[in-house]
């Protein structure tokens, strides 16, 4: 699939990754946020497009919920979450009058905003655009894929937890990707065990290995397991940069490894 010649505001974006999950509560927005931070610390310019219209949590995760979106000649200027302007973010959370307002919209209005997000945000030059989607396979997902299709997305990253219910939902997500022609770049198993901070033993609080087995059976890459980590939860609650502040934490090696694999996939083949 060729990239559109008239790319508009996405013409300077090198790689677009959609982060999907079959169900809510698996930590999809967490993975989106932490991968963006890890890519940023690898020297890349990263944008995050939050199209989870009914649950926009990323502004809080990046301590950006009090910031405003401004207009320029080419559309909306995204919110920059660091002084170096190496991470930019667009979310409906910035457009609500009050942060606790509910988005009670029917499909056509949601789809129209998603199309506007895809065309009217002045991202500038980015190495990666991470698109955080709602759970499931709904109108919003179809609208997102259709809006980004002309720009040849790198693919979809699927997030699951070890339980059979979550893995079953991701199977349906794989079917969605196949039907819409969206390449799957990998599966991540989140909340995969708890590492004791004292003895470093990993206890599988849920089940084990569901995401890896699904990746094997589906013939898609398995990018790794991210364990439950109180420091990761703390950083998200406080809007801190987990990758920078907690390099010795249990989840850090897994997140760094996932980011490295994405960088390898994005590198030109020799």
UniProtKB/Swiss-Prot annotation:
PROSITE patterns xref list: MRP
GO cellular component: cytoplasm
Cofactor(s) demanded: [4Fe-4S] cluster
A GO term for molecular function: ATP-dependent FeS chaperone activity
Keyword Iron-sulfur carried by entry: yes
InterPro entries noted in UniProt: Mrp-like_CS (IPR000808), Mrp/NBP35_ATP-bd (IPR019591), NUBP2/Cfd1_eukaryotes (IPR028600), P-loop_NTPase (IPR027417), YlxH/NBP35 (IPR033756)
Lineage top rank: taxon: Eukaryota
Task of the protein: Component of the cytosolic iron-sulfur (Fe/S) protein assembly (CIA) machinery. Required for maturation of extramitochondrial Fe-S proteins. The nubp1-nubp2 heterotetramer forms a Fe-S scaffold complex, mediating the de novo assembly of an Fe-S cluster and its transfer to target apoproteins.
HAMAP family, per database record: Mrp_NBP35 (MF_02040), NUBP2 (MF_03039)
Protein known as: Cytosolic Fe-S cluster assembly factor nubp2
